[in-house]
Amino acid sequence: MESGNNKKILNENSAPSISDLKYKTQEKITNNNENNDNRLNKKNLIFYSILILILSLLSFLLYNFILRLITQNNNDKNDLGIEEGKKKRKYEEELEKIKKELEEEKKKRKEEFEINKNKYYKEINKTVVGIDFGSSKSGFAFIIFENNNKILIDEITKEIEFKDYIEKSCIIMKDNKMFEYGNKANKRMNKPISKEYIYFDRIKTNLDPKKLEKDSSNIKIKSSFPDNVEMPLKLIIQEYLKGITDDCLEIINKKGHNFTKKDINWVVTVPAIWNEYGKELMKECAIQAGMENIKIALEPEAASLLLFDDTSIDKKYKEKGKIFMLVDAGGYTIDITLNEIVDEQGNLKQLSPPSGNSFGSMKINKDILNLIQQVISEKSLKDIKKDSFDVYNNLLNQIEEIKIDANDDDSDNKDFIINLNSNSCGWFSSSKCIKRTDFGEITYDNNNIYIPKQVIKNLILKRISPIIDHIKEIYKTFNDINIDLLAIAGGFSNSNILKKEIRKYFPNAKVLKNPQISVMKGAVIYGIIPNKIISRKSPKTIGVSSYSLQRPGKECKDPEIVDGEMKCRYFDIFKRKGEDIFNNEIIEKTYTPLKEDQKDIFFILYSSNSYNPTYIDEEDVKILGSFDLEMNETNLKREERKALVRMEFGANINAYAKNKISGKEIKLKANYYNQN
């Protein structure tokens, strides 16, 4: 029987036929093929299922991986944002902290500045002019202020102006008044001039402190031309100062100002060796010349104030604690001061009182003039001065140039030539001659004198030697301290021979920039910051006279019997020699009248070179000044009537005496430094 599939159903007990076998075989083959196909399909299904599963798994893993990456990235971004936020907040907090600290520091510095503003700024309501009144040349520097200007102290020297040339220290007088001064006067004297004009040269050399008396009004000096005409020294100085201050005022007002001399604070410098009389004379002359607001400064101190801002001096010498010696080499004197830099503003502490001597370079001029006199004879030189002063004046100018220009270069053996214009005199030979002098053989002819270079060098070395010795002596005195720098200022410091000789013995020596104007510029700084030198050394022992019992073992020369007791006038010390003197330092002492009926106390201010003087009658004790204080309260007991003596120290000393009962006070002002 066939099925719908054309298959036969066979009896199991029947024997198969070939056709049946074929059929069965074919069927079996068909079934096998079907089974194989089924198995293959199952395998493919399994394979693809596994593949799909794997791919799904991979997709899942990839998805999760990508998801994690995205999540991580977002988390990282979030973390980064959080971190950045933290950093930003921390930065803002630190910034705020810094701002607060800066505000606090600013506030603190502002408070500190208000307390110590003079360390940084200086308020000035007047223009300041510094005048260096020199032996051969003078000049001025200035700084202009008005309407309470404020200036950084560090900027002061940058603002200082000075004249583009230095004036000769000479003057022509006519009818007791200045006709011309300075370079104009000197130039005029290089030509023949009428004898109605009276010429004074190198005025400052007439101010010998040892010859000046307390009353200097009668001191007269002799003119250079006409020869030996006498005029009052004070008149000559004040007229010269009048000329230089008039010039200064004109230059300042050309800058758009309308100042008078009263609108200016003036500072005039003087040598360290000058005594009180010389300083007082200079001050009186300055006032007469119109300088009402006048201060007197010592030349080496003024130059010292400039050192801190001098660009030619290495910064290592300007540090706190550095010690420098300043040598002011001028024409008349050599002045020296020793200072320590005490802070970053360049304030100074004086380690030794300014000292000096008369070893100035003008002595070299005299030596060269003496040499010329030996060549042409003393009479001939006098005749030239008398009859041909223009030739004589030109001769002096040539000598000044030779002194500065002389050098120590052995390769240059040219003679120095001094021209004497033989047309005005007939004492020279028409041919070259040789003259033997104390300085060697000198050649001359009808026009010129030929001075060998070595002769000039020897003359200069002769005068430099005492300067070197004086500096050595100071080094020896202070051998326990290290002097870092030896600074040289003054006009003579331009001498090549002087510079070489000083450096030979003192390798740390440096010449200030523009040394010829260092004193006048330093004088301006002194006028602005007079307390820049915070302490000085007392060059003398200072005190007043008082009565006491005679000291055992030491008798006074003139004892007095008071109330039955032998008493002496002893030296009551206020400040000892060598002690520090601080600006505005005050020392007070109380005294009573010697007798019951005494109606006044006569105080005398004294100085002494001794560290511990006992009596005022000792040899080196000198009077600086005096004042008489009324004590009329005789109804009171002597012990109740008290007088107070107060001394204020600084650049100068001011002494006061006060009646403590009546309150009346009198003042004595005395500049006491370096009394001779």
Task: Label the model's feature ranges.
Residues 1-116, 121, 140, 181, ...:
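Terminal export signals
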Residues 80-218, 295-297, 347-348, 354-355, ...:
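Early-domain small/polar-rich strand-loop-helix modules and first-structured segments
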Residues 97-135, 141, 145-150, 197-324, ...:
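Nucleotide/phosphate-binding catalytic cleft detector across ATP-hydrolyzing
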Residues 113, 121, 292, 426-462, ...:
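Acidic low-complexity intrinsically disordered segments
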Residues 131-137, 300, 319-335, 340-343, ...:
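A short acidic Gly-Thr/Ser loop motif
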Residues 170, 299-313, 365-370, 512-548:
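Glycine-rich phosphate-binding/hydrolytic loop that grips phosphoryl groups
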Residues 197-200, 204-213, 219-235, 258, ...:
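Gly/charged contiguous loops adjacent to phosphate- or pyrophosphate-bearing nucleotide/cofactor binding elements
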